[in-house]
Regions:
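Conserved beta-alpha-beta core of the PfkB/ribokinase-like small-molecule kinase fold
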Residues: 85-168, 185-187
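Structural alpha-helical scaffold elements that stabilize or flank donor/cofactor-binding regions
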Residues: 78-79, 139-140, 171
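Conserved N-terminal subdomain of the carbohydrate kinase-like
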Residues: 12-92, 111-114
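Conserved phosphate-binding/catalytic region of the ribokinase-like
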Residues: 107-108, 161-274
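Alpha-helix C-terminal capping segments
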Residues: 2-13, 57, 222-224
Length: 274
């Protein structure tokens, strides 16, 4: 949801494929997404109950999560075609039975010309051990034009491999753009021909909830603005110059910096970015 909200606030036309109930949490989700300019698929608001995540903050603003989840999205609920890009990530892409529908939608829409992005955004408390989800994650990486992960995601999934080794492996699986975020240390991005490393944007940290999602929405928004998503995304992303890639990542880092300066997952609106 956070990526969709971030895109909506950046004035992108975005539809969220989700499921939640007619309860106080579900009604809050519906109001929040609508206020941020996000459309919902038909049937999104008719689940038996709304899943939830409780965030507990540490002294440094980092968060740990406790989840109460039901995920039963059906592929037939997601409209066929009409999207130039599809994004997925985290629990929704690995928790069954909904995860199989997510993968089916990605394969269907990619065959129809959409580009695909993926953020593993691991949640060990739900996903279990790395070995429980690696096959699914590798399949989703192989489907994707863009993969964004945090350094913490990578170290959990591949504890014996370096960031460079994992980045190189994902590129070898057909990904055109791999981005690794590193919290206060910024982010690194790599295509088949360019590598960019940028520091985090200066900010005061209130908490880190939603930072990665805000980075993702900022990156997708600026890639869309540059016509680098859609049918020819693989070629277009691979052809980016170092300066173009640097500008894309810098914008995403600015979005994340604004989000961590606020309490909760509160991504910026376009006007906040000047």
């Amino acid at each position: 949801m956070n990526v969709a909200v971030g895109l909506g606030r950046l004035e992108r036309d975005v539809t969220l494929a989700t499921r939640f109930g007619h309860d106080h949490r579900g009604d809050a989700i519906a109001s929040h997404t609508l206020a941020s300019g996000v459309s919902l698929i038909d049937g999104a608001h008719n689940a038996p109950r709304t899943s939830s995540a409780k965030a507990t903050l540490a002294a440094d603003g980092s968060a740990e999560y406790d989840f109460d989840l039901v995920w039963d999205l059906g592929a037939q609920m997601v409209p066929r075609g009409g999207f130039f890009h599809v994004h997925t990530g985290s629990i929704g892409a690995t928790l069954e039975p909904g995860a199989s529908a997510v993968e089916a939608v990605l394969r269907r829409e990619k065959a129809l010309g959409a580009s695909v992005s993926y953020d593993p955004n691991v949640r060990p408390i739900v996903m279990g051990r790395p070995s429980d989800v690696l096959e699914k994650i590798d399949a989703l990486v192989s489907l994707s034009d863009i993969v964004k992960a945090s350094d913490e995601d990578v170290s959990w999934l591949y504890p014996e491999k370096s960031l460079e080794e994992v980045t190189t492996r994902w590129l070898s699986l057909g990904v055109s753009l791999v981005v690794i975020t590193q919290g206060v240390h910024g982010a690194q991005a790599k295509t088949g021909r360019e590598t960019v490393v940028l520091p985090a944007a200066a900010t005061t940290i209130a908490d880190t909830i939603g930072a990665g999602d805000s980075f993702m929405s900022g990156m997708l928004s600026t890639l869309a603005h540059r016509s680098l998503l859609g049918t020819h995304a693989s070629e277009a992303l691979s052809a980016m110059t170092g300066e173009q890639l640097r500008e894309v990542i810098a914008f995403a880092l600015r979005c994340a910096a604004i989000t961590v300066s606020r309490v909760g997952a509160d991504p910026p609106r376009l006007a906040d970015l000047g």
